[in-house]
């Protein structure tokens, strides 16, 4: 009996020591963390010199789903802040983030009226930001104040929060289309071959020349009829040979939509984006996004889906991910399993285990590795890791 107990204790000890954790970020690494809360999108970026940026902080307030990851003991915003502090530990001020970028004004990216103080507002209880960037500062009037306030019932709260931060020293800015300097390395900018390129926002895109922009909607169309998604901020991050695309909920158009609503902004920006290594699926992989022409032009090796409801992604979009419209591999990652039943096991089998999705680009930007961290644990153990890919 004693021998059996000793063997069991030894096995338990071996199991505990076998757990693996993501090695700490270090100078020269570029990390992208797609944070899994079950309630919206949030991406934490640690740049090679220690500059940090949080993109979005969603919380739908159980409007679409009752999923809470890792559990409901904290709000999604509180879990986002907890996650950021955990992985920013190697930095001098883990609670201070250099940039916050809000891609657009929807609850699954900023917070919901159903839970006052949710999303971004909960994040502010723990984290501070040196710069806040969104698509509409300071007037918040495009395409009209009425349409913006209609898109989000927490706009008053959001504007007050940003202005409150500005009064305490935070810098607020409108996303500058065409800029390669608005978001940049702040500590050792000359040491690394790194660039963030602002491509589109507010239905306008960079022309590729200077800071000139052009509208993406036709003159005959009433821009006020668009939903908020098409105004999303879209940008690329380049480090050496590695390139990452993130475009909020930017939309394309199905064949049936093109005649009714000219919302195919994906096709227009695709040539500016060009081939990428990793992309976050636009609009959570919903049916109106990540169309074949966009995929063919970007040709990502890795597609990451951040989900907040059933239909993230839709089956038709997941099939587009898998369709060989371009040569080479395409690895699929996802932050939750809410769409598993609708997708079916055949499609689901193409996704890596779900959870916090981490892209780690190694020093110089010529190699990277994918990790998935346990969305139910408080210490973020690794549940999947890829080989190291060389570019």
Name each model feature, range by range:
Residues 4-14:
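Sec-dependent N-terminal signal peptides
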Residues 25, 50-100, 115-122, 253-272:
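Pre-active-site segment of Zn-dependent metallo-hydrolases
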Residues 32-33, 53-55, 101, 244-246, ...:
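Residue-level marker for buried hydrophobic side chains located in beta-strands
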Residues 97-108, 279-283:
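Metallo-beta-lactamase
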């Amino acid at each position: 009996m004693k021998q059996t107990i000793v063997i069991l204790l030894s096995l338990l000890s071996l199991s505990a020591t076998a757990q693996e954790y993501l090695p700490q970020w270090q100078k020269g690494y570029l990390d992208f963390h797609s944070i899994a809360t079950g309630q919206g999108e949030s991406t934490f970026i640690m740049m090679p010199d220690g500059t940090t940026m949080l993109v979005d902080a969603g919380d739908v307030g159980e409007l679409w789903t009752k999923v809470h990851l890792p559990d409901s003991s904290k709000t999604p915003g509180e879990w986002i802040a907890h996650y950021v502090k955990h992985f920013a530990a190697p930095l001098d001020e883990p609670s201070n983030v250099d940039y916050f970028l809000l891609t657009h004004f929807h609850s699954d990216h900023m917070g919901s009226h159903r839970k006052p103080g949710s999303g971004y507002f909960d994040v502010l209880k723990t984290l501070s930001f040196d710069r806040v960037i969104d698509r509409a500062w300071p007037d918040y009037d495009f395409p009209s104040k009425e349409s913006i306030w209609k898109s989000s019932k927490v706009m008053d709260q959001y504007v007050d929060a940003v202005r409150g931060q500005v009064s305490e020293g935070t810098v607020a800015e409108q996303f500058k289309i065409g800029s390669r300097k608005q978001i940049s390395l702040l500590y050792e900018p000359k040491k690394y071959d790194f660039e963030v390129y602002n491509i589109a926002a507010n239905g306008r895109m960079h022309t590729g020349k200077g800071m000139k922009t052009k509208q993406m909607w036709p003159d005959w169309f009433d821009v006020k009829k668009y939903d908020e998604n098409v105004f999303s901020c879209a940008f690329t991050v380049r480090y050496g040979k590695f390139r990452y695309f993130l475009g909020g909920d930017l939309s394309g158009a199905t064949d049936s939509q093109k005649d009714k609503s000219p919302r195919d902004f994906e096709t227009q920006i695709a040539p500016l984006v060009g081939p990428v290594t990793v992309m976050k699926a636009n609009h959570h992989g919903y049916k109106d996004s990540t169309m074949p022409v966009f995929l063919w032009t970007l040709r990502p090796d890795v597609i990451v889906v951040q989900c907040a409801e059933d239909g993230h992604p839709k089956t038709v979009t997941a099939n587009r991910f898998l369709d060989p419209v371009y040569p080479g591999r395409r690895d699929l990652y996802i932050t939750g399993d809410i769409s598993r039943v609708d997708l079916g096991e055949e499609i689901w089998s193409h996704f890596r285990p779900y959870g916090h999705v981490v892209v780690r680009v190694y020093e110089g930007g010529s190699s990277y590795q994918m990790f998935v961290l346990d969305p139910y644990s408080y210490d973020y153990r690794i549940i999947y890791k890829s080989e190291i890919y060389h570019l």
